[in-house]
Amino acid sequence: MLRRGLLSFFMVILIDRGTSQLYSSDMCNWKGSGLTHEGHTKDVEQVYLRCSEGSVEWLYPTGAMVINLRPNTLTSAYKHLTVCIKPFKDSKGANIYSEKTGELKLVVPDGENNPHKVYCFGLDRGGLYIEATPQQDISRKITGFQYELISQRTLSDLHTVSDPCRPCSDTEVLLAVCISDFVVKGTISAVTNDEELQESLINVTVDKLYRQKSKIFLPKDNGGWEGMIRTPLECGVKTGMGSFLFTGRMHFGEPRLGCTPRYKDFKRIYLEAKKQGLNPCEISTD
């Protein structure tokens, strides 16, 4: 490798060849063209990104590249991160693999086109290896995706991504209330199931808005708030069923359902923890 330390925050070098390339890159996003790679199809490009979220866009892919993802704070904690990628609509022209010490595992095959599907794996597998597939005509071929790094030590993050239908433990509920992107008390007024995307879109009528980082829930004319949350279809969410405490995270710009206990159960859990001095944060239960 050529001076990896000097160039680690940007798209950097070719392995085996030192020809200069024209790319746009910052710490979070990378965009480049395979047209500058023609004639060097056996070269493997190295890209270094230092961000918790961003995007990669490879126009006219030829040859291969390795995407090295790390958080913007380099500590040993990066080994406990989950990488999630969401391919762009109509992304094509290359296979995407996870890579660990030379071993490749196919994550997204070329041509698999589901604009809402998200692929996740542990960062301890290493980087992403993207290999262009043989093409007679590379024009109009673009391989691209968004990525997010999610802490496996943050229980609400891990629950939302890896096992969204599993009921949360008391500890997970208490932590979710403190660190989720949205926390509301409300009821399920409608559920729309999308068989193609294998998702349910939950319409929530909100009685009490504790927190939201994005404008998920908007005021209603007759008081309260209303908004939509996504969850996998397999979770079997139904309308009615009483009052809940809804928590969750923004995931690729969409609100995803996290821990959602019945409100009466949350109130019991919270008050018991508070009595013992074990509640990680304060929240009104009136």
UniProtKB/Swiss-Prot annotation:
Protein name: Meteorin-like protein
Family affiliation: Belongs to the meteorin family.
Annotated organism of origin: Xenopus laevis (African clawed frog)
Glycosylated residues in this chain: N203
Protein keywords: Disulfide bond, Glycoprotein, Hormone, Secreted, Signal
GO biological process, alphabetically ordered: brown fat cell differentiation; energy homeostasis; negative regulation of inflammatory response; positive regulation of brown fat cell differentiation; response to cold; response to muscle activity
Protein's job: Hormone induced following exercise or cold exposure that promotes energy expenditure. Induced either in the skeletal muscle after exercise or in adipose tissue following cold exposure and is present in the circulation. Able to stimulate energy expenditure associated with the browning of the white fat depots and improves glucose tolerance.
Signal sequence bounds: 1-20
Disulphide-bonded residues: C28-C51, C84-C120, C165-C235, C168-C259, C178-C281
Cellular component, GO annotation: extracellular space
Alphabetized GO MF terms: hormone activity
Subcellular localization: Secreted
Encoding gene (name): metrnl
